[in-house]
């Protein structure tokens, strides 16, 4: 089996050295070249034809976002962004995911070398996932058509969504067409702490429904989506006639919900960037219906209107 060929673009010589050490320490991948800026990277991409690019956000001559936008338009390839763990860094990273980056790695704020080496296994796994990603499914999505508003649904109705790699854009595509009469949505998206608040704020500006990072003890309301804070779990508890969020994901939970009577949806392979969580849920028997991403919003509201609880 051939190794995954990686090219790293970063203006820091130390970061290029660290990324080379990390990539070359795994037997299934190799660093074929490094570049100090996007203009050098452009020539190296032509020369080495890498499978995956790791790309810093802030660089001289051309920043990472400008380069990513041009790259995805002219020569699409799997990209893993390398970003600082700051408010500004999270905003830029979310924009990179919109432009077509598969995933991202956050730089530690202190002890760069020790911190990055501690992330070695995580970085390698992100590179492996990126190498297998479907670029066709990760093309920028056009704004979905707003769905027709129906009567306000009962606070008893809920939709739960779980997402991992490639999920940020899929979630946007699902939430954006939902009318204010939609039931409450509870969302778990695999992200580090700090990024989920920026993600929620970004969606809140784009969607008709309210979108926010969930808070412990918060009452769940129709017409709102609640995103679990990074690295935390989210549960529901009864509070009188209402539901209340408890901040504390995946295929096993989905199977349990189906067994309890929920109607469960999974995104199909053709529209997934990485067909990981949906495949596991389908294989475990936790899925009632498999649909294309473009049909998820409409199917959710149709099932809810018919009186069924939904988990996707």
Swiss-Prot record:
The active site is at residues 164, 190, 249. It catalyses: [protein]-L-glutamate 5-O-methyl ester + H2O = L-glutamyl-[protein] + methanol + H(+); L-glutaminyl-[protein] + H2O = L-glutamyl-[protein] + NH4(+). One of its GO terms (biological process) is chemotaxis. Gene3D superfamilies: 3.40.50.2300, Methylesterase CheB, C-terminal domain. InterPro entries: CheB-like, CheB_C, CheY-like_superfamily, Sig_transdc_resp-reg_Me-estase, Sig_transdc_resp-reg_receiver. Residues 5-122 form the Response regulatory domain. It is found in: Cytoplasm. The keyword Hydrolase applies. Its EC number is 3.1.1.61, 3.5.1.44. One of its GO terms (molecular function) is protein-glutamine glutaminase activity. The keyword Hydrolase applies. One of its GO terms (cellular component) is cytoplasm. The modification 4-aspartylphosphate is found at residue 56. Phosphorylated by CheA. Phosphorylation of the N-terminal regulatory domain activates the methylesterase activity. Residues 152-307 form the CheB-type methylesterase domain. Its main location: cytoplasm. Keywords: Chemotaxis, Cytoplasm, Hydrolase, Phosphoprotein. Contains a C-terminal catalytic domain, and an N-terminal region which modulates catalytic activity. Belongs to the CheB family. Involved in chemotaxis. Part of a chemotaxis signal transduction system that modulates chemotaxis in response to various stimuli. Catalyzes the demethylation of specific methylglutamate residues introduced into the chemoreceptors (methyl-accepting chemotaxis proteins or MCP) by CheR. Also mediates the irreversible deamidation of specific glutamine residues to glutamic acid. This is Protein-glutamate methylesterase/protein-glutamine glutaminase. It comes from Shigella boydii serotype 4 (strain Sb227). The lineage of its organism: Bacteria, Pseudomonadati, Pseudomonadota, Gammaproteobacteria, Enterobacterales. The gene is cheB.
């Amino acid at each position: 089996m051939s190794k995954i060929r990686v090219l790293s673009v970063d203006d820091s010589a130390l970061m290029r050295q660290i990324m080379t050490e990390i990539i070359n320490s795994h037997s299934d991948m190799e660093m074929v070249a490094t570049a100090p800026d996007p203009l050098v990277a452009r020539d190296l991409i032509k020369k080495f034809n890498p499978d995956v690019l790791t790309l810093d956000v802030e660089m001289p001559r051309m920043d990472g976002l400008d380069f990513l936008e041009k790259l995805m338009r002219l020569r699409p390839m799997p990209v893993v962004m390398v970003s600082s763990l700051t408010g500004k860094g999270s905003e830029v990273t979310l924009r990179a995911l919109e432009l077509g980056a598969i995933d991202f790695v956050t730089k530690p704020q202190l002890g760069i070398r020790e911190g990055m080496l501690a992330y070695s296994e995580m970085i390698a796994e992100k590179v492996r996932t990126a190498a297998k990603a479907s670029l066709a499914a990760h093309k920028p999505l056009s704004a979905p058509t707003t769905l027709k508003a129906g009567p306000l649904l009962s606070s008893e109705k809920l939709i739960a969504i779980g997402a991992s790699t490639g999920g940020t854009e899929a979630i946007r595509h699902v939430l954006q067409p939902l009318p204010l009469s939609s039931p409450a949505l509870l969302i778990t998206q695999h992200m580090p702490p700090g990024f989920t608040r920026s993600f929620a704020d970004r969606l809140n500006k784009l969607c008709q429904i309210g979108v926010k990072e969930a808070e412990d003890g918060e009452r769940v309301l129709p017409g709102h989506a609640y995103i679990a804070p990074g690295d935390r779990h989210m549960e529901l508890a009864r509070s009188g006639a209402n539901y209340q969020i408890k901040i504390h994901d995946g295929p096993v939970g989905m199977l349990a919900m189906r067994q309890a009577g929920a109607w469960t949806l999974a995104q199909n392979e053709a529209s997934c960037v990485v067909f990981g969580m949906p495949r596991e849920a389908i294989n475990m028997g936790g899925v009632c219906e498999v649909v294309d991403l473009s049909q998820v919003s409409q199917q959710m509201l149709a099932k809810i209107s018919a009186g069924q609880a939904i988990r996707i």
